[in-house]
Regions:
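NUDIX/MutT-family hydrolases
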Residues: 93-95, 104-136
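A conserved beta-turn-beta hairpin within the catalytic core of GNAT-like acetyltransferases
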Residues: 31-34
Length: 142
């Protein structure tokens, strides 16, 4: 169960960069339903981080990706109106590149869009997602 968990849930995220663009998905499910974010999701029991990332990206974007280095590890803790922990994820974000396919909306996303780096503010990303994306561009450029 993801809502009101007994322990943190491990998740993965993909920063997929193409030139000066990054791939974003509009989330189809909570938390952050209908918000723009990086493709990714929860790791299943018995699944490696990298395998989970490849699966989640394919489910959300129909792309096959090659998983690169870790960009950042962060936690996302959401509390309800009574200050109870409603969500707690530990997320490992990776820099990825497209191996094959065309980005289209998969089963776990409302929309998929290549966003210009200079235009990220219009997607109203979380502070953490914006930081991870900028760090990924810096890693790619170094």
């Amino acid at each position: 169960m993801r809502k009101y968990p007994d322990h943190p849930i491990v998740g993965v995220g993909a920063v997929i960069i193409d030139g000066d663009r990054v791939l974003l998905v509009k989330r189809a499910h909570e938390p952050l339903k209908a918000e723009w974010s990086l493709p990714g999701g929860a790791v299943e029991v018995g699944e490696s981080l990298e395998a989970a990332l490849v699966r989640e990206v394919r489910e959300e974007t129909c792309l096959d990706v090659t998983v690169g280095p870790v960009v950042e590890v962060l936690d996302r803790i959401g509390r309800d109106a009574n200050d109870r922990v409603e969500y707690h994820f530990v997320i490992v974000d990776y820099l990825c590149r497209v191996a094959r396919g065309t980005a289209t909306c998969g089963s776990d996303a409302e929309e998929v869009e290549w966003a210009q780096r200079s235009d990220l503010v219009r997607y109203r990303l979380t502070t953490a997602a914006t930081r991870v994306i900028e760090r990924a561009f810096e890693m790619r450029d170094s």
